[in-house]
From Swiss-Prot:
A motif (Nuclear localization signal) lies at residues 187-195, 203-216. It is found in: Host nucleus; Host cytoplasm. RNA-dependent RNA polymerase which is responsible for replication and transcription of virus RNA segments. The transcription of viral mRNAs occurs by a unique mechanism called cap-snatching. 5' methylated caps of cellular mRNAs are cleaved after 10-13 nucleotides by PA. In turn, these short capped RNAs are used as primers by PB1 for transcription of viral mRNAs. During virus replication, PB1 initiates RNA synthesis and copy vRNA into complementary RNA (cRNA) which in turn serves as a template for the production of more vRNAs. GO terms for biological process: DNA-templated transcription; symbiont-mediated suppression of host gene expression; symbiont-mediated suppression of host mRNA transcription via inhibition of RNA polymerase II activity; viral RNA genome replication; viral transcription. It catalyses: RNA(n) + a ribonucleoside 5'-triphosphate = RNA(n+1) + diphosphate. InterPro entries: RNA-dir_pol_NSvirus (IPR007099), RNA_pol_PB1_influenza (IPR001407). The gene is PB1. Its EC number is 2.7.7.48. One of its GO terms (cellular component) is host cell nucleus. It is an enzyme of class 2 (transferase). This is RNA-directed RNA polymerase catalytic subunit.
Length: 757
């Protein structure tokens, strides 16, 4: 039977059908090749928006820097970065006046965090620019390399394990005349393979020491590496994002902690909350505006869009904000918070891999690294690239571009939200001193503005005043991309509001399906996603039931585990049929072992193993949940695991699901091809850390494991722990005298070795 698709929508209010127009099915676009072009675009655009500023030269690095602050007053419609310091400070003062004590309290909270945060906070996060190797690394490795270099250069404050002490080392490292680093390099040589008698290339990894002078070190410390942002839907052009190095990260973390603490106290801030909590916050603001406008006033809402938010923000402005926010605080605290914006005013953008050239005729490919862009003849490039390079050349130093104005993506989300909210705060009648007034919501660069006034002229005047006020602090509302509507219908951070929030279900579409972790996790994640969407996103019972059936079908095709009594032939069907026939209680077999599906929308919260446990044959139970089963490399069994699900846009979300460890919870082994690359040295380092940490946990089981206080090293802590445990075990008769003295001897030997080293 043919279904006319328009019939589906006859009963659906138009606004609920909005989600069908979103570009969220199918694979998102990924970038290929280098991000060099996108990064040059960002650098050139940022300078263009601030071009009327003052040029200066950094005395330490020689980098040319553009400062647009307090430059000419901005022109209408043209995005610009000419923020006025006094306007920003005044906005902060009014924000404090409307929220007495907000800055004071947030500073106190942050001070406590600063004193307690451990340096391992910096191991969170994915790729990080590793300045010692001049490329990206996992955060933990980059941190370890930095600390290793610091220690070999006599910077040892970090040994206390506190982040603030590590940052002291960072500050000191910038005063050193030179720094010695260890870099990895690889040698290739041709050797004859004994087995096959063929010539093969053998690679060996070496480590070599290298001295870096103060100028080069500062450039590296201030460098943000750039990459292309992947998987962005609904855009034709890709764009560049930045990953800062370890020197900057710690300082940024403290600034964002302070800003987060302020945002939590601001009703107009869409950060740091998310999900239903955010919706409730938004609904409150809308309710307030609508209640006040019922009889006499008109109320309109702008779904706002800002032009190039990051590229018009300025670190110098953030410095002014921080100086104001921390005005009565101790000197050390003010200093530590002002370092991040100062580093950002002196930042350098690394241009990435450079360009790849190929000659079709001679079948040749060659890579032009970013370092060469300053000197290469431009005749090889096409016109648009030539223009980019010409423009960026005066800014280049060692393959990085000096980028003083602008804030690269995602660095100070919280602090820039505080700036946005401070302008929304000025909409109160006591500040506008006229008949119109405004309020709204701000979440990083996204905003919604609600304006109330007695008539249309008043609304227009209110919007104009808001627009101009924003301009004074470097926020550029886009007149082309923002639209105004009667209050009650607007969009904010992809939440659609129509007298209440309508579920934008298409956003969740990419997270339905089989994740591809392993059979156990995938089943659990799949049903949890459906459950969560029933709770949060208006997924109705009939649709959920259908989603469940589609998921099970998808799952069976992915893992080739069709029911034991099916006719479908796959690689696994012979084994699964055999199992089916041997099993008495067939309902007890897991879906991944060819069993039936017992899930329906009422029991999605129960892990499959628990759901079927009572139905399983005893020997099947024994095989399934046997910790000695050699095929399972068991992680510690946690009752809750975290999966990364991809919503349609925004960052990947972490989602909790129940984890029951069975023989289906396997962990795939690492791809071996990495062992032949220059990454190998890094991999060996990582394995060493892994071993050390495992050993440490053996000495300090989690029940007794407190973060080490004081400055004893891991080795010292383990030795003293071993001695205490040995004495207790010896005195209670659990170990013999010989064993006791042997342990003591080993401990002394270890200490002796450490002293010699």
């Amino acid at each position: 039977m043919d279904v006319n698709p328009t019939l589906l929508f006859l009963k659906v209010p138009a606004q609920n059908a909005i989600s069908t127009t979103f570009p969220y099915t199918g694979d998102p676009p990924y970038s290929h090749g280098t991000g060099t072009g996108y990064t040059m675009d960002t650098v050139n655009r940022t300078h263009q928006y601030s071009e009327k500023g003052k040029w200066t030269t950094n005395t330490e690095t020689g980098a040319p820097q553009l400062n647009p602050i307090d430059g000419p007053l901005p022109e209408d419609n043209e995005p610009s970065g000419y923020a006025q310091t006094d306007c920003v400070l005044e906005a902060m003062a009014f924000l404090e006046e409307s929220h007495p004590g907000i800055f004071e309290n947030s500073c106190l909270e942050t001070m406590e965090v600063v004193q307690q945060t451990r340096v391992d906070k910096l191991t969170q996060g994915r790729q990080t620019y590793d300045w010692t190797l001049n490329r990206n690394q996992p955060a933990a490795t980059a941190l370890a390399n930095t600390i290793e270099v610091f220690r070999s250069n006599g910077l040892t404050a970090n040994e206390s394990g506190r982040l603030i002490d590590f940052l002291k080392d960072v500050m000191e490292s910038m005063d050193k005349e030179e720094i010695e680093i260890t870099t990895h390099f690889q040698r290739k040589r041709r050797v004859r393979d004994n087995m096959t008698k063929k010539m093969v290339t053998q690679r060996t990894i070496g480590k070599k020491k290298q001295r870096v002078n103060k100028r080069s070190y500062l450039i590296r410390a201030l460098t943000l590496n750039t990459m292309t942002k992947d998987a962005e839907r609904g855009k034709l052009k890709r764009r560049a994002i930045a990953t800062p190095g370890m020197q900057i990260r710690g300082f940024v973390y403290f600034v964002e902690t302070l800003a987060r603490s302020i945002c939590e106290k601001l009703e107009q801030s869409g950060l740091p909350v998310g999900g239903n909590e955010k919706k409730a916050k938004l609904a409150n603001v809308v309710r307030k505006m609508m209640t006040n406008s019922q009889d006499t006033e008109l109320s309109f809402t702008i779904t706002g869009d800002n032009t190039k938010w990051n590229e018009n923000q300025n670190p110098r402005m953030f410095l002014a904000m921080i100086t104001y926010i921390t005005k009565n605080q101790p000197e050390w605290f003010r200093n530590i918070l002002s370092i991040a914006p100062i580093m950002f005013s002196n930042k350098m953008a690394r241009l990435g891999k450079g360009y790849m050239f190929e000659s079709k005729r001679m079948k040749l490919r060659t890579q032009i690294p970013a370092e060469m862009l300053a000197s290469i003849d431009l005749k090889y490039f096409n016109e648009s690239t030539r223009k980019k390079i010409e423009k960026i050349r005066p800014l280049l130093i060692d393959g990085t571009a000096s980028l003083s104005p602008g804030m690269m993506m995602g660095m100070f989300n919280m602090l820039s939200t505080v700036l946005g909210v401070s302008i929304l705060n000025l909409g109160q009648k006591k500040y506008t001193k006229t008949t119109y007034w405004w309020d709204g919501l701000q979440s990083s660069d996204d905003f919604a503005l609600i304006v109330n006034a007695p008539n249309h002229e008043g609304i227009q005047a209110g919007v104009d005043r808001f627009y101009r006020t924003c301009k004074l602090v470097g926020i550029n509302m886009s007149k082309k991309k923002s639209y105004i509507n009667k209050t009650g219908t607007f969009e904010f951070t992809s939440f659609f509001y129509r007298y209440g929030f309508v579920a934008n279900f298409s956003m969740e579409l990419p997270s339905f399906g089989v994740s591809g972790i392993n059979e156990s996790a995938d089943m659990s994640i799949g049903v949890t996603v459906i459950k969560n969407n029933m709770i949060n996103n208006d997924l109705g019972p009939a649709t959920a039931q259908m989603a469940l059936q589609l998921f099970i079908k998808d799952y069976r095709y992915t893992y080739r585990c069709h029911r034991g009594d099916t006719q479908i032939q796959t690689r696994r069907s012979f084994e699964l049929k055999k199992l089916w026939e041997q099993t008495q209680s067939k309902a007890g077999l897991l879906v991944s072992d060819g069993g039936p599906n017992l899930y329906n929308i009422r029991n999605l919260h129960i892990p499959e193993v628990c759901l079927k446990w009572e139905l399983m044959d005893e020997d099947y139970q024994g095989r399934l949940c046997n910790p000695l089963n050699p095929f399972v490399s068991h992680k510690e069994i946690e009752s809750v695991n975290n999966a990364v699900v991809m919503p349609a846009h925004g960052p990947a979300k972490s989602m909790e699901y129940d984890a029951v460890a069975t023989t289906h919870s396997w962990i795939p082994k690492r791809n071996r091809s990495i062992l032949n690359t220059s990454q190998r040295g890094i991999l060996e380092d990582e394995q060493m850390y892994q071993k050390c940490c495992n050993l440490f946990e053996k000495f300090f089981p989690s029940s007794s494991y407190r973060r080490p206080v004081g400055i004893s090293s891991m080795v010292e802590a383990m030795v003293s722990r071993a001695r205490i445990d040995a004495r207790i075990d010896f005195e209670s008769g659990r170990i013999k005298k010989e064993e006791f003295s042997e342990i003591m001897k080993i401990c002394s030997t270890i200490e002796e070795l450490r002293r010699q080293k």
